């Protein structure tokens, strides 16, 4: 997907393409604040930068923090929650690590450390995501960072980034190709998740002798 994106939208980019600010193409925001007293032992995973980085690298993560299902539903009903195609990006300390939310994901996240890209207007999130993780996107992020002791990306800074808009027919064809790739990746992640759960269930039983392998 990254190779396809680079060829279509960077190497073959046309100077005549319309240029807009990122803030005009989508909503850039953060989450509602969750307080320490609201953490629970199980429920809906609550992600920080650490978990988003793990998801980006491996496709899975083990959440250490949770909020209750009731609190999550309350927030989701009033303000929304990350859904398929949305993008979360690390914005404090480790900058610019982006993760595109999958259909199977259900979680909430820490305000301040992560920035939420949603409500894409006429431009698929797949294109924005691959631009963010491309060299040209990372250079744009580098140019707007603030701070010296602890670097950060601000919502206003992200909104100000210029973005070239490919022609509609180019976007539609790319989105079709991209979705095929994403479906394959999602299938592989589900397979890995199933096998991991099976391993975690069977291994203790094998070690304790509860389950025996004949042969």
Listing of model-derived features with the role each one plays in the protein:
Residues 1-36, 41, 160, 164, ...:
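Non-catalytic DNA-recognition/assembly elements of restriction-modification systems
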Residues 48, 69-137, 147-149, 154-155:
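A short beta-sheet element
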Residues 43, 63, 110-113:
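A generic structural signal for short beta-strands and their flanking turns/coil linkers
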Residues 15-60, 69-78, 95, 146:
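Low-complexity, Lys/Gly-biased intrinsically disordered segments
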Residues 58-60, 129, 173:
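Short, charged, solvent-exposed linker or helix-capping segments at domain edges/interfaces
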